[in-house]
Amino acid sequence: MKNLVILTGAGMSAESGISTFRDAGGLWDRYPVEQVATPEGYQRDPALVINFYNERRKQLLDVTPNRGHELLAELEKNFRVTVVTQNIDNLHERAGSSHIIHLHGELTKVCSSRDPYNPHYIK
């Protein structure tokens, strides 16, 4: 069986209705990255950061994987597929893909950077 590595980014999720970060009118136009996507931003205003990501999680409830997600999952019938994605949603998983690497993490899986007993603890 052949191996396939597939790279995906914002366009894949945008087709499902997920807001992008960088496009005109995207999330970074409304929220400076320093305020909601850095440890310093969290230290300054944890409520803003938590609300920002909770809104992203809420958006996931209203969208479904698109045909592109489904086609990638179907490739697993004939290939060993690894999807490497910049997206932080779980649409690849929901479409049925089983080997996904989220380069920037995933909204539905969070961990504390302050919990030394957490296996994902960041020092």
Locate each region found by the language model.
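Conserved catalytic core of sirtuin-type NAD+-dependent deacylases
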Residues: 1-123
